[in-house]
Swiss-Prot record:
Gene3D superfamilies: Peptidase S8 propeptide/proteinase inhibitor I9, Peptidase S8/S53 domain. The active site is at D221, H253, S409. This is Sexual differentiation process putative subtilase-type proteinase isp6. GO terms for cellular component: extracellular space; fungal-type vacuole; fungal-type vacuole lumen; Golgi apparatus; late endosome lumen. It comes from Schizosaccharomyces pombe (strain 972 / ATCC 24843).
């Protein structure tokens, strides 16, 4: 069976707040009026996930009519400039030869389609011109495989009928809204290193001196100001995914996130190595296709490092996306444990992706008074809460700049940092073992203001320090 057309997508979610302004990287998924929407974590049938949550790999017969792979979409779309852009997911067990043959077939079909169109399609400067394949995704053997590109509706229908195809999803705009500065002092590090915080504990971070030594943390975001003094030479540029963009963070969001993970003064894992993976343009916008390409890059880089487990941070998200959740789950299976933001809509996090990812650590935001932050998403998809209101960290503008901002985007790197911190102490741990440890170490039943009846775990991040 194919994925149901319902239960797949819901409203978009912003992930970082600056003053009263949402300032995360919300994914704005596309809308398709003929697809039903529901705001729950999608439960796919056994044709797609086995008992371990892995993508299953049944051999499908060729599609026909209603058996075509679903064309997925979501509500509250911003598809500006993305007409006819799609992301295609293939069976994960395809051989290298089958995968290559499939992409060759798509390219050939696309060229034949272009040749058959009106003259306007021959003008590559025309907005109607279809450019074909853009990204090809291959996370490794029996892992996430697929591609993205711009195709006519005729080619999309042919793709949906191909037996290798699991799903087709419309590409989506990812963006960060205007940033504003808030006043406030750092307190998050003190909170995650004390089971209960007394007045004298404010500003005191208790931690093991190893603090993420020799652990890699990938910041999948707007980039990182890698020469900031707070990174002490431990930050490097990994990849710039958006075509034609620069190897810089001209936004600030990614640099702030990286600082909470591993900077000298503001970081949880003060010896971890930061790798910048830019998936959002300096303007603060990007596409879902580029985000998935960034996740793929982290998997490939991690595998080449020879390390058993690395850490990833995604302080971005939006409407529920089967494709993004599947990609993130595959990354975790391949050894990159991702911390992802729950979202800032004061709504069910299961409405959002990658918050609905089963294998990532989904993080809600808490306040200095141990309350669930007024903006934080909640629900059964949230795994843990961490400090997310008035968080001081590194910033752009100079190599010493700082900024204080808020959101689940700020809570998430506390948990990514904790993951690196734990791996520094337990380098043989697998990605799933890291997630289990983070949850096991958490402080139970200290948070206030969690919505009654929301199935939300009352768990606050803690580094396990002995006071």
């Amino acid at each position: 069976m194919r994925i149901p057309y319902s239960n797949l997508f819901s409203a978009a979610a912003g992930l970082a707040l600056f003053a009263s302004t949402a300032c995360a990287a919300p994914v704005m998924p596309a809308t398709d009026s003929d697809i039903a929407h529901a705001g729950i974590r999608p439960e796919l049938d056994n044709a797609f996930y086995d008992s371990h949550g892995e993508a299953a790999t049944p051999k499908h017969k060729p599609h026909a009519g209603p058996n075509a792979a679903p064309l997925l979409s979501a509500s509250n779309a911003d598809t500006t400039g993305l007409d006819s852009h799609y992301i295609i997911v293939l069976q994960p067990d395809l051989s290298e030869q089958e995968f290559q043959a499939h992409t060759n077939w798509v390219s050939e079909m696309h060229q034949m389609d272009i040749a058959s169109q009106e003259d306007e399609y021959y003008d590559t400067s025309d907005s109607n011109y279809m450019f074909g394949l853009k990204h090809v995704y291959d996370f490794g053997e029996d892992s996430f495989k697929g591609y993205s590109g711009q195709f006519s509706s005729n080619i999309v229908e042919q793709i949906r009928l191909h037996p290798h195809v699991i799903a087709v999803e419309r590409d989506q705009v990812v963006s960060i809204k205007k940033l504003e500065t808030q006043s406030g002092a750092p307190w998050g590090l003190a909170r995650i290193s004390h089971k209960s915080v007394k007045y004298d504990d404010i500003g005191k971070y208790v931690y093991d001196s190893s603090a993420g030594d020799n652990i890699t943390a990938y910041v999948v975001d707007t980039g990182v100001s890698i020469h900031h003094v707070e990174f002490e030479g431990r930050a490097s540029w990994g990849a710039t995914i958006p075509s034609g963009d620069v190897d810089e963070d001209n936004n600030g969001h990614g640099t702030h996130v990286a600082g909470t993970i591993a900077s000298r003064a503001y970081g949880v894992a003060k010896k971890a190595e930061i790798v910048a993976v830019k998936v959002l343009r300096s303007s603060g916008s990007g596409t879902m296709a580029d985000v998935i390409a960034g996740v793929e890059w982290t998997v490939r880089h991690h595998k080449s490092s020879g390390k058993k487990t690395s850490v990833g941070n995604m302080s971005l998200g939006g409407g529920n996306s089967f494709v993004l959740d599947m990609a993130v789950d595959s990354a975790v299976t391949n050894g990159v444990i991702y911390a992802v933001a729950a979202g800032n809509e004061y709504d069910d996090a299961c409405y959002s992706s990658p918050a609905a990812s089963k294998k990532a650590i989904t993080v809600g935001a808490s306040t200095i008074n141990d309350q669930m932050a007024y903006f934080s998403n909640y629900g059964s998809c949230v795994d843990i809460f961490a400090p997310g209101l008035n968080i001081l960290s590194t910033w752009i503008g100079s190599n010493t700049s700082t900024n204080t901002i808020s959101g689940t985007s700020m809570a998430t790197p506390h948990v990514a940092g904790l993951s690196a911190y734990y791996l520094g102490l337990h380098p043989a741990a697998s990605a799933s073992e890291v997630k289990d440890a983070i949850i096991k170490m958490g402080i139970h039943d200290v948070l206030l203001s969690i919505p009654v009846g929301s199935s939300t775990i009352n768990l606050l991040a803690f580094n396990g320090a002995q006071e």
